[in-house]
Amino acid sequence: MTTQPHNRRRFLQLAGLGTVASLAGTPAAAAQNENTQKNRRQRFELGLASYTLRKFDLDKTLAMTNRVGLKYIAFKDFHLPLDSTPEQIKEVVQKVKDAGLELYGGGVIYMRNERQVNNAFDYAKAAGMKVIIGVPNHDFLPMVNKKVQQYDIKVAIHNHGPTDKVYPTPASAIEKIKDLDPRIGLCIDIGHTQRAAVDPSIPAEKFADRLLDVHIKDVSASSAKGSTVEIGRGVIDIPKFLRTLVKINYAGIVSFEHEKDAGDPLAGLAESVGYVRGVLATI
C-alpha cells in the first residue's frame, strides 16, 4: 500500500518525539510541556456509532464496545427500535448502564414527516439521549426547531456525501439551519465530507459553534467512489482533524463509525481506535 503524504509527515513528527522525550528531564522542558498540555487539552470523548455493529444484537454490541475501551454509544435503531415502548426503552437503557456505558444519542434518525419528528423526540426523551443525530427533511426544520426548544434535546444534522440530495456536506446543512436554534447543529461525518472532496477540518473549524457530534472514519478516495477503510489507511488527514477539534475546544463525542466488514468489524474498529488514541497522545 502506498503511504499517504500526510501519514508520512506524521511519521516524521512522531519520530521527532524521541528528541522531545530526551529533553523532558530539564526544568525548562518540563515547564514548556506543562503549559502546552494546559493550552491544548482534549475536551472531547471517544464513542461508538452503533451502526458499526449493525449485524450484532444488543448484548454483543455492548460487549464489543467495551472490548475496544469506548464508554459512549449512540444507537442506530437496530439496537433500540424507534417503535419501542417506554418499558422496552427503559429496559435497554438499564442494560447499557449495567454494561458501564452511556447512551448519549441516537441516529441516524430520518424525519420525513410530522409523525417521524414527534416520534424521534419522544424516543430520545424516553431514553435520556442528549442528542439526536438526524436527517430532518427541509420542510420539517421549523417543527424540529420547536421540538428542540420544547424538549431541550440537540439535533445534530448528519451529512451523507456527494450523492445525498438533502445534506451532502456540512455547509449545505448550515445553509438551512443558520437562523434556527443553536441546539440544531452538525454531526460532521468526516468520511462523507471527504467523499464530497471537502477537507473535514475546514467545516469543523468554520462551523465550530454548531458542531454537536462527529462520526470519525477514513475513506479510500476523495470522491463518491471512496469507501470506508481502517483509520490511518485512507486519504483523510486524521492528525490534522484531531488537532482542529482540540483547537476549537470541541467538547462533544467523537464516535467511530466503521462501516467496513459488517460481519466481522472488530479488528478494523480496534485498529481505528488505537490509531486515534495514538495520535491524541501526541497532541
PLM region spans:
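Glycine-rich, proline-tolerant flexible connector loops at the mouths of alpha/beta enzymes
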Residues: A74-E91
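Residue-level signal for short, function-critical loop segments
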Residues: T52, G161, K260
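Flexible loop residues that form catalytic
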Residues: F78, M111, N137, I216-V219, ...
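Hydrophobic faces of well-ordered beta-strands that scaffold small-molecule active sites
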Residues: F44-A49, I73-F75, L103-V108, I132-G134, ...
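Short glycine-rich, flexible loops that bind phosphorylated cofactors or substrates
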Residues: L82, L141, S223
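Histidine-acidic metal/acid-base catalytic patches
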Residues: T2-E45, K55-V68, K125, P170-I188, ...
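Active-site acidic/histidine proton-transfer and metal-coordination neighborhood
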Residues: G16, V20-A21, K38, D59-L62, ...
